[in-house]
């Protein structure tokens, strides 16, 4: 069965430069949405969206109804800021999505892209988590917007490290005024200071368009979608492939093309969805970020205005929750970089609002709702940071019709671990080139051995469980020791393993 997908993006800066990140309208997040359905459902979705557009025909601009019809100031306190007409419009739009919809969302930090380029020579190790360090640097710059650091980054990247060191040292000193709230931040900043010794000047600060399509490719694989087309909103010069389209093709997506949104309702739907989510996330960011003249060590909560909701406004949160969390849910449905606090906060807000049945439920303990919501968001951020510590890749199993799948080294791994052959060892030393070590369900250790014509996966003797779990833990901390030659020694009732 063929599937039709449509792509659009929001909060995109074509070039990243000093004026980009210091402008009044700047927002660090870049968002993309890809929506789609089976081709036999295309007509039904098209009819629904055309009915929606005609109902609000007076809102069209240049013949199109897109997310620009909702202005940022109309979401300054989230859906609580919307008037009745806009509540009705968004409710009608969200209702177009049903269980036949496939929705993929991507979010990235513009500053994270710059920092990743500057520190591209650094790698995770068992001794230092570079992902966490990059996260801390990005969060510090996005949250505090230190002018001297940002200016040094663009005027003279060679001066960036010195400026960042000065800024972090200053923040550590200021944070000591309230270690109850800032102890964790200080620990992170102190760790970052330990590695700020060398930095490579980036080759380019142009935006990298690949990440959103890498995640979408994983989403398609996880869903088992093989026959599809992807249509992107056309940007740039006519007759010339955009960087976005080139990136989509580079990542292996097939049947990709771009077109004018006025000719394709699916692109307009993607624009509406990603635009509304982008504006909502932007308002959430500004509401949770301290202003320049506010005390930096104070806890920042959403104002009570976010929670003065009517039943209709609350229903919008519940509808959007259904779209983001429930319709054709998947591990890769929402894809982001390491620094994705705004996205995580947005998901936390949806989760929090969804548990209310009516606006009266919110009113029962109204004054405490900002605190309760903050706790919900904080827990999500904490879980995200814990997941970030896990360095082992998560990959979709592409073919679930067979009784086995192929691991990253191309070896057969049976779903029923009892069918996995055991590595046969003779008395004395047995040498193998080991590609990887893992743990199957039930705690059974596995090893992938280099072989011809294909690598082979075996069960290891139970005596090597502790050895295997240690290596998995090291890999999870960023220290992968394989491939490498391993000597398995069988002596009496014991088996030993030595990495050469």
Positions of the model-derived regions?
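Short linear interaction motifs
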Residues: 83-88, 211, 463-468
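OB-fold ssDNA-binding interfaces and closely related basic DNA-contact patches used
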Residues: 394-453, 492-500
């Amino acid at each position: 069965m063929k599937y039709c997908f449509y792509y659009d993006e929001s909060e995109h800066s074509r070039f990243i430069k000093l004026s980009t990140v210091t402008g009044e309208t700047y927002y660090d997040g870049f968002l993309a949405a890809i929506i789609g359905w089976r081709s036999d459902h295309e007509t039904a979705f098209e009819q629904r969206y055309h009915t929606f557009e005609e109902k609000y025909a007076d809102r069209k601009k240049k013949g199109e109804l897109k997310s620009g019809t909702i202005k940022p100031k109309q979401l300054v306190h989230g859906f609580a800021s919307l008037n009745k007409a806009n509540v009705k419009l968004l409710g009608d739009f969200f209702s177009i999505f049903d269980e036949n919809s496939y929705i993929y969302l991507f979010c990235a930090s513009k500053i994270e892209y710059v920092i990743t380029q500057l520190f591209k020579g650094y790698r995770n190790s068992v001794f230092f988590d570079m992902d966490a360090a990059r996260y801390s640097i990005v969060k510090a710059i996005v949250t505090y917007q230190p002018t001297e650091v940002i200016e040094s980054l663009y005027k003279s990247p060679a001066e960036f490290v010195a400026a960042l060191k000065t800024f972090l040292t200053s923040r550590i000193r200021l944070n000591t005024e309230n270690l109850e709230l800032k102890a964790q931040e200080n620990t992170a900043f102190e760790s970052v200071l330990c590695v700020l010794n060398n930095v490579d000047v980036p080759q380019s600060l142009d935006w990298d368009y690949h990440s959103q399509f890498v995640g979408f490719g994983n989403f398609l694989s996880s869903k088992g979608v093989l026959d599809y087309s992807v249509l992107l909103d056309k940007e740039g010069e006519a007759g010339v492939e955009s960087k976005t389209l080139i990136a989509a093709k580079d990542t292996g997506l097939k049947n990709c093309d771009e077109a004018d949104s006025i000719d394709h309702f699916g692109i307009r739907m993607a624009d509406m969805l990603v635009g509304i989510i982008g504006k909502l996330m932007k308002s959430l960011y500004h509401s949770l970020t301290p202003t320049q003249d506010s005390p930096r060590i104070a806890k920042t909560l959403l104002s009570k205005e976010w929670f003065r909701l009517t039943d209709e406004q609350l229903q919008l949160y519940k509808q959007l929750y259904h779209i983001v969390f429930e319709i054709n849910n998947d591990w890769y449905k929402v894809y982001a970089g390491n620094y994705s606090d705004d996205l995580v906060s947005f998901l936390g807000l949806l989760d929090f609002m969804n548990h209310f049945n009516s606006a009266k439920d919110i009113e029962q303990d109204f004054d405490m709702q900002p605190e309760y919501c903050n706790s919900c968001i904080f827990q999500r951020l904490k879980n995200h940071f814990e997941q970030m510590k896990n360095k082992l890749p998560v990959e979709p199993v592409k073919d679930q019709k067979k009784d086995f799948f192929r691991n990253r080294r191309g070896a057969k791994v049976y779903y029923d671990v009892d069918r996995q052959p055991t590595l046969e060892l003779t008395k004395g030393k047995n040498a193998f080139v080991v590609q990887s070590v893992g743990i199957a369900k039930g705690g059974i250790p596995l090893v992938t051995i280099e072989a011809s014509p294909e690598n082979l996966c075996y069960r290891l003797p139970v005596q090597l469980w502790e050895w295997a779990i240690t290596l998995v833990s090291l890999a999870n901390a960023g220290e992968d020791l394989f491939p490498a030659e391993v000597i398995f020694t069988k002596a009496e009732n014991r088996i030993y393993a030595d990495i050469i």
